Structures are given as structure tokens and as C-alpha cells.
Amino acid sequence: MTKAERIKQTRLETNQKRKEQIPVVYQLKVNLNSLSKKDRQRLFFLFSEAKWLYNYIVADIDSRLKYETYKLSEVEIKAGDKFETRPIENLSSQMRQAIVERIKQSLYALHKSKDNGNKVGELKFKSFVNSIPLKQYDVTFKFTNEQKTKVKLQGLEKSIRVLGGHQIPKECEIAKAELVRKASGIYLHATCYIDKSLFIKTWENRVNRKQVSKPREWKTFNQAIAIDFKPTGVVLSNGLKIEWKIEETPRLKKLQRTISRKQKGSKNRQKVRVKLRKEYEHITNVREDIVNKISSLLYRYDTVIYQDDNIHVWHKGQFSKSIQTSAVGEIKRRLRNSLRVSTVLIDRYQPTTKTCSQCGNEQEIELSDRVYRCAICGNEMDRDLNATYNLLKLVGLDRSEVRPVEHETTVKIFGANPKVLISLVQ
């Protein structure tokens, strides 16, 4: 059997095995304090060299985008008004190959978008490359101890200490990773594959940093729930209304004013830019924390019924600012891809808002009308709650009132979060 045939056979076996597995990405933070000054500089130089190689290829894609490009030991880049030669010393061969493959994938995506009738441009130069693919475990990277607290990267002499390796279960198969640079530090995003039959078990029986099993306390609600999405939150069929708003912080606005006054290219501007990136990352983390808590609440139900709303269109309407800061689309995506709760998707053209949940009368309702008033039976209730009742009726279920255990669990999950408003609607 030739090498090409062995690769083809292995790829077929892997694809067959992946059908029974689910990918999970674990985020590990690199402990920069454990590195020497020299090793820290080499780690950050990986991202600089990745940028140089990327821009070198993009400058002349027709002649430079080829297989042998990853073998280059130096590239020519434009620095100001002149060209300079920069060495590629720290990037390993597989890291360079992954960067070349990333450019090919970007070109393919542009080609597909053009075939769909969209207007496309061309690949542009990058000021920063903040992620480096590590495409093969045991070659590009590997954990050097059983606790998964040390990682050896191809091209670097010493192992790097990482925090959070205890999250990765022993039953999983580590496939690939990405080295990601953020304002708060450098992270390793490890992609692991877990058998679908073991996914819930490994999630419930997590281990702490001392490798001690700590089962999760997981209260479940043995009933179905319907959810209606809003630009600023969600409404559940049990009457719970959860709203949140993540706006620009005063510190962010102040930093934006400060950086506009700094001279371009100066060190002071660079310092403010780092602070600005950290503030943006903080806002993103706050938003993601709320999405995680909403998902945690919904996963406790047996079934979640929701309508296939075209949230992409909401970005173009009068609620565009609200929908961009609420991350409602992320909640919908998690429900669609989740294995921890069964979901029922209702067609987006079902008139759930226009229909009375009491008598079935269908009538027009303005967007400004927050209360549904039926002209036939006189039913008056919140328009979003009325929509959730109709979602339940479409799958043959009755509505349910909020129970004390649901209310207590919701309050416990969100805590005293000043950015989240929890209320009951009728």
C-alpha cells in the first residue's frame, strides 16, 4: 500500500469515527509568568512571523500561493516606504502549512460567495494575525504530563505551562488546537472529540484542578418550555421574562476619545490601544456569561420549542443596535446544535404573534402594541407570552405556570447581575 493509499484509508476511518463523536473546544490560558523573557519573546514572535508570511503571500497570490511556500526561511515585507527582509525562525513547518491552507480556504470562500451572486473583493493585508493553527496533535503540539498543565509546541525548545487543562476529560480524543492572542493574554483552544454516549456523563462528572471528581448539582424541570426571542431578551411560556442590555461602558468611551488624540505610530497610542482591546474583551465576556446562563436555564427542560425567526433581518431594522448587543442569535445557535436538550423548531411563517392563544382568532397587531387584545373573546395578555402559548399549542402541549423551583433556580443562576432584568409577565 502506497503512502497516498494509507492516508486515504486513515482519512476514511477517521470520518467514520467522527460520526459517533461530538467536538468540544476547551480554552486553556498560557501562564506567561512561568516563561523566561527570551521564551516569552519567542512566543509573541510567532504571531509577528505569521503576519509577515500571510502578507507576503497575499502581496502576490498568483506566484506565491504554492506548496513550497512553507519552506521559506525569510520573506520580504514593506516597512514604511521601503522593503525589508524578515527571517521566519520560530514558526514550525506545520504552522506555516496551516497559514497557507487558511489563505486557500479564504479564497475558496470568496469564490463560493461570488457564485451565490454576492459582490466580493480580494484578500487584504493584515495588521495583526491573532491566531495560529496547530493542526496535528503529537506533532504540532502535545501535552507533556498527565494533568495537561504543560504543552510542547513545535519549534519551541521548552514546554509552556497552561491553566485549565483539568477541563479536558480522559475519555476524549485531542485532535487539533489554535494558539490565540487576546488582550488579556495568550490562549490555547484545544479541539477534542468525545463519544456522544459519554458527552453528558463527562460533563456531569467534571474534575477540579486536583483531579478530584466533583459532580454538578443539576436541577431539572420535567416539562417542556416554549421560548419567544426579543431583540433585548427572551420570554418563556411559564411567564418568565429575561432581558439584558450590554452597552458601551464609560471607560470604553473615554478610551476611544483618548486614542483619537494620540499620534499614530506613537508608543502612547499603542498603550491606549491595548487598554481599549482589554475593555472590548471585557464587554464580550460579560455578554458571553449571560448567554451561558440563559443556555444553562434552558438545558434543564425536557424540550425547548422555539420559532425559526430570521434574526439576520433584525440587524437591518430599527432594533439593530439592541440585537447586536444582546447575542440572541447565539442562544438560538446553541439550541440548534445542543445534545443536552431536545428541541422543536417551528416554521418562521407561523402567525404565532397574530393568533389569539384562547380562541384562535387571527388579527393584525402593530409592533408598538406590547399587549395582545383579542377582538373576539376579549383576551388581554403580553404579546410575547401569547406567542409562546401558541408555540406550545402547535406541538400539542398545554401552557404551564412558573413553579417556585423554576423561579428559585433562575434567580440562583443569574444572581445579583445589574445587567439582567428578570420579571413575570401575564
Model region roles, listed by residue range:
Residues F47-A50, I99-L107, K275-I283:
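Short amphipathic alpha-helical coiled-coil/interface segments
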Residues N31-R40, F83, D115-N116, T144-K148, ...:
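Intrinsically disordered, low-complexity coil segments
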Residues M1-A98:
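Gly/serine-rich nucleotide phosphate-binding loop at the start of the catalytic core
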Residues D62-S63, L72-S73, K114-K126, K267-V274, ...:
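Short coil/turn segments at secondary-structure boundaries
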Residues I57, M95-H111, L385-D398:
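Stable alpha-helical structural segments in soluble proteins, enriched in small hydrophobic residues
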Residues E74-G185, I246:
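Acidic carboxylate diad motif detector
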Residues V58-L65, L107-N118, I194:
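Long, hydrophobic, amphipathic alpha-helical segments used as structural scaffolds
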Residues Y187-Q426:
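Positively charged, helix-rich recognition surfaces that bind polyanionic ligands
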